[in-house]
A protein has these predicted regions:
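Surface-exposed alpha-helical segments enriched in charged/polar residues
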Residues: 39, 43, 161-168
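Short, well-structured alpha-helical interface segments that form or flank functional binding sites
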Residues: 32, 36, 115, 158, ...
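Domain-level recognition of nuclease-like catalytic cores that cleave nucleotide substrates
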Residues: 164-169, 174, 178-228
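Ordered hydrophobic segments in well-structured contexts
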Residues: 89-91, 101-103, 119-123, 144-146, ...
C-alpha cells in the first residue's frame, strides 16, 4: 500500500465520515498528512471525554456552522472567515467546559502582528464564531493547541529553527506540537534543548509514536478541562 493510501485509510478509520471525492490518494501528501494528524486530535478528544455518554459531543460543521457528514478539508492556507473556501471544521464539547473548534490550515495573528499559517489549530468556539462574524484573524492567545505538521522524510535544522521562531511569535494557551512523518537526531536535539514538544515518525504503522502523540494531546485537553 502506498503512503498516501495508508494515510487515507487511517483518516477514514478514525473519523468514520464520508470524505470529499476530490480528497483521495492523488491528493498531495502534505494535505493528507495534515488531515491524518487532524484525525488524531479528534481521537484524542474522544478519548478524553467528547462523547455523549460522558456528557460531551463531537460534530463536524461546514463554513456556515451547519452540521455535516461530508468532510472537506482545506488544502491551502486560508482565513477562518473565508466564504470562498468550503471546508469542514470539528466542534469538540466536554461536559461543562467551553466548546472548542479544530481547524486545518488557518491564519493566526501573533505578537508581531503578522498573519502566520497554523497547520492545525484548536481554539475556543466562541472566539472562532466571533472571528467569522467580524471577519478577523484569530489571535494566538485564543488557541488552546497548535500543531506544525511536516510530511518530510529527511528533516533539516531549518525546520526546527522555523518552528522555534513560530512558537515565539504565536503563543498559545496550552500546547504547541511539532509533528513529522520523518525524523532527525539534530532536529530532535534542537527542539528538546529548547523545551519544545516534538513527535517524529508519526505515521500509520508506527503505533508507539502515534499513541505517544495522542496521549500528549489528551494531556493538553485534560489540562484545558482542569483550568475551566
Amino acid at each position: 500500500m502506498s503512503i498516501n493510501a495508508s494515510l487515507l485509510q487511517s483518516i477514514r478509520l478514525r473519523l468514520g465520515r464520508a470524505m470529499s471525492p476530490s480528497f483521495g490518494t492523488a491528493t498531495q501528501g502534505t494535505d493528507l498528512y495534515e488531515a491524518y494528524i487532524f484525525s488524531l486530535v479528534i481521537r484524542a478528544a474522544l478519548n478524553e471525554g467528547a462523547l455523549p455518554e460522558q456528557g460531551g459531543a463531537l460534530t463536524f460543521c461546514d463554513r456556515d456552522g451547519q452540521i455535516t457528514t461530508n468532510l472537506l478539508f482545506r488544502r491551502s492556507p486560508g482565513q477562518i472567515y473565508a466564504a470562498t473556501q468550503a471546508c469542514t471544521h470539528a466542534v469538540i464539547e466536554f461536559k461543562g467546559k467551553p466548546s472548542l473548534e479544530v481547524h486545518i490550515g488557518i491564519k493566526v495573528m501573533g505578537r508581531l502582528k503578522v498573519a502566520r499559517e497554523c497547520d492545525i489549530a484548536v481554539l475556543y468556539r466562541d472566539r472562532a464564531i466571533a472571528c467569522r462574524t467580524q471577519r478577523r484573524i484569530p489571535k494566538a492567545s485564543e488557541l488552546i493547541i497548535a500543531i506544525e505538521c511536516k510530511h518530510i522524510e529527511a528533516l533539516d535544522l531549518d525546520a526546527a529553527s522555523e518552528f522555534i521562531g513560530l512558537t515565539s511569535d504565536l503563543r498559545v494557551k496550552e500546547s504547541w506540537f511539532f509533528v513529522s512523518s520523518g525524523s532527525s537526531e539534530g532536529v530532535a536535539r534542537m527542539l528538546a534543548n529548547d523545551r519544545k514538544e516534538w513527535h517524529h515518525n508519526v505515521m500509520p504503522g508506527e503505533p508507539n509514536n502515534v499513541n505517544r502523540l495522542m496521549y500528549s494531546l489528551q494531556s493538553s485537553f485534560k489540562n484545558f478541562k482542569a483550568k475551566h
